[in-house]
Amino acid sequence: MNFHILTLFPDMVENGLKTSITGRAIESGAISVVAVDIRDYTTDKHRHVDDAPYGGGAGMVIQPAPVCDAYEALCKKLGKRPRVIYMTPQGRVFNQSIAQDLAKEEDLVFLCGHYEGIDERALELIQAEYLSAGDFVLTGGELPSMVMIDCISRLVPGVLGNGDSAEVESFYDNLLEYPQYTRPEVYEGKPVPEVLLSGHHKNIESWRREQSIRRTLERRPDLLEDASLTLKEQKFLDSLLKEQGESRLKELEQLVREAVKSDETPGSDREYYQQMKKVKKLLNEKKATLQELKGYYKVLGALKQEI
């Protein structure tokens, strides 16, 4: 995969990505990172890229011509027009799902703004997509672009030494990663969980999955809405939620019942059980999340009431 970074500070991004995993990936050829200096596409001897904003206001704005010319030169070199990601707090907040989508690209362009941003016309002409590292303001787009490239690179085949590494890390399945342990077996009176020493791989996998669910509930419960869980895992989550007086499965069952049953409808009990059988099958095969099913039956029930 090839990353192209349009920036005013090429040394910053190239040097920052030439270490650790991304550095080894560059050396092996799994990825390439090329920084393009936007100043190389200016026309004056002082290489100015910015000017005062029309309408007044603080700061300076990057002019459209150097940005567009840099991108068009890259397109000519590649023989195609790759996706452009503009780093801005106005964009969608970057996450693992977006990373997985971007990792499918062969070439990806990151546009790093500075000062008060980039002339809007340039962004429109190059059809930039807006992404943000979070709801905060930085001096420029270089650091966010490096963060995103690091994340996306890990999903590129051949970058990680262990092919399973990316699949068990936090957010891959909308769950946080399970706790990790290494030697010594006991430290400051705190032992490693016995199951990890058992050598029983199935039990270890089950324990890790449950720990991921438990940790996500404690630290990022918002992620559970779209987590892909089997029926057994849903029941485990429900057992944790019951301690808080909640039950996600009970809520789904009630929505299914309301969607298929009314006092005047004969055979609705049978339809309810048939629907729940399908629901359990979809959950076990991870073809739908609990949240998706709840949404479906909520709408179905509302439509029946309207009819």
Feature map (PLM): residue ranges:
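S-adenosyl-L-methionine/SAH cofactor-binding core of RNA-modifying enzymes
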Residues: 63-114, 119, 157
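Hydrophobic/aromatic beta-strand patches that form the interior of the parallel beta-sheet core
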Residues: 4-6, 34-36, 85, 108-109, ...
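Charged, low-complexity interaction regions
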Residues: 260-270, 282-294
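Structured adenosyl-cofactor binding patch, chiefly the S-adenosyl-L-methionine
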Residues: 118, 122-169
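Internal, active-site/partner-interface "lid" segment
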Residues: 143, 155-195
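Amphipathic, heptad-repeat alpha-helical segments
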Residues: 249-276
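C-terminal accessory regions appended to core domains
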Residues: 208-251
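N-terminal nucleotide/polyanion-binding subdomain common to many enzyme families
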Residues: 1-74, 202-218, 222-225
